[in-house]
Amino acid sequence: MSLLSALSSRRARLCGLLIILLLLGAVAWQGFSAAPPSGASGSPARQSGAKPGRGMTQAIPVQAAAVRRAEQDSYLSGLGTVTASNTVTVRSRVDGQLMKLHFSEGEQVKAGDLLAEIDPRPFLIQLQQAQGALARDTALLDNARRDLARYQRLAKDNLVSRQELDTQASLVTQTQASLVSDRANVDNAQLQLDYSRIRAPGDGRAGLRQVDEGNYISSADTNGLVVLTQTHPIDVLFTLPEGDIPRLQQALQHQGTLVAEAWDRSDRQRLATGHLLSLDNQIDTATGTLKIKARFENQDDRLFPNQFVNLRLQVASQMPVLLIPAAAVQTGREGRFVWVVDAGNRVHKRSLSVGARDGESLVVLQGVDEGEKVVTDGIDRLTEDARVDIIAARRPGAAADQEDTQQP
C-alpha cells in the first residue's frame, strides 16, 4: 500500500507541474501577441495596430493664393512666327567678275544703295560699239535725206526717173529704221553697264554674303549675292482655332482694327505692340485653324525673322476676369489643372481652362471660382484629398536676417 500511495502522489505532482507550465505558456503567448512589431513607433495609432486613416496623416505645408477678380483687356492668343515683310534675294542681272562688295553683313541698307560692282569693261565696249553704229547711221541718214532733196528737184525737170526718186526715198526710210535699232542697242548696252553696279531693290537688313570678291558670277546663280529682309516694319504670322473666329469677327466689326501684342516665348515680357494686318481667306482643314498676320513697326529691332513669339489680339477692353498665379497651374495627361484647398484644408485636383498671361498671373476661363484657394508651392507632394497646412510665403532675405540675429 505504501508503494501505491507513493506512485499516486508522484503522478499528482507531475500533473500539477504540467498544468502550471501550460498556464505560464498561455500567459507568455498572450504577451508576445500583444507586443508592438519591431521598429514600430510609440504612437497610439501604431500601438493599437490601427492603420493610418483620415484625420491621422501629417499635414503637408504649402503656400496658396486666392482666385481674384480684376478688370482686364480680353485677348485671343496664339503661337506665332516673326516673318520679314519683304524678303529679296539680290542676284546679278549680268555675267562677269565680281570686283567689289559695298555692304557689311547685318547692315541696314536703303533702296538704291550700291551693294556690289561687276567688271564694267566688257559692257563699256558694247556701249561704245552701239554708239558708233548709231553715229554712222545718223550720218548715212543725213546724206540720204540730202540726196532725196536733190532728186526731188531734178524730178521736177524730168532729169531723173521716177524709179530713182523712189529708190532714194526708200533708202531714207531704211536708214531711219536702222537708227531706231541703233538707239535700242545703245539703250541696251547702257542698261547692261548699269546692271554691272548692283543696287539694293528696297530697304532691309543684309544677311551673310553668298559670294566673295573675285568670283565670276552670272544671272543664273540661284544663291545670289545676299538676301535682304525688310524688318521695318515686320510681320508675325500666327493661327487661331476656328472656335475663336466669331469673337474675332465681332471685334473687327465693332473696332475696325485690333491691337496686337507680341510677347516672348515664356509669355512674360511684351516685345512689341502693333495691329492686325490681314486674315487668310480659308480655314486649314488639317489643323482647324485660321492663319492671321499682324504688323509691327519694330524700330527697336526686338523682333527678328523666324523668331517664335506669343501673339495676343485685343478683342475687348476692361472686361471682368478671374486671375490666378501662373505657378499654380500644372499640366498633366488630362490637361491643365490646379490643386484647390477646401474649407477643411484638404486639396482636390481641378481641371481648368486658361487664357492670356498677365505678368505672373493667368486669366481663368473656366474651372475655379472667385475666392477659392489654389496651391502655389509644395505641389509635388500633393495627392487627392491630402491634408495641407497653409503657410505664409517667406519674405526674401528673412532667413539670412534670422541667421544674422542668432550669431553672437
From Swiss-Prot:
Superkingdom of origin: Bacteria
Q: Where is this region: Disordered?
A: 35-55
Tell where it localizes.
Cell inner membrane
An example of a Gene Ontology cellular component annotation for this protein is: efflux pump complex
- Membrane topology, record value: Peripheral membrane protein
Question: Which InterPro entries does the annotation name?
Answer: CusB_D23, Multidrug-R_MdtA, RND_pump_MFP
Q: Which UniProt keywords apply?
A: Cell inner membrane, Cell membrane, Membrane, Signal, Transport
Q: Where is the composition biased (Low complexity)?
A: 35-50
A molecular function (GO) held by this record is: efflux transmembrane transporter activity
Q: Which Pfam families match?
A: HlyD_D23
Primary localisation category:
membrane
Signal sequence span is 1-28
Annotated PANTHER family: MULTIDRUG RESISTANCE PROTEIN MDTA
Family classification: Belongs to the membrane fusion protein (MFP) (TC 8.A.1) family.
What is known about its subunit structure? Part of a tripartite efflux system composed of MdtA, MdtB and MdtC.
NCBIfam families listed in its UniProt record: PRK11556.1, RND_mfp
Name this polypeptide is given: Multidrug resistance protein MdtA
Native species? Edwardsiella ictaluri (strain 93-146)
Gene name of the encoded protein? mdtA
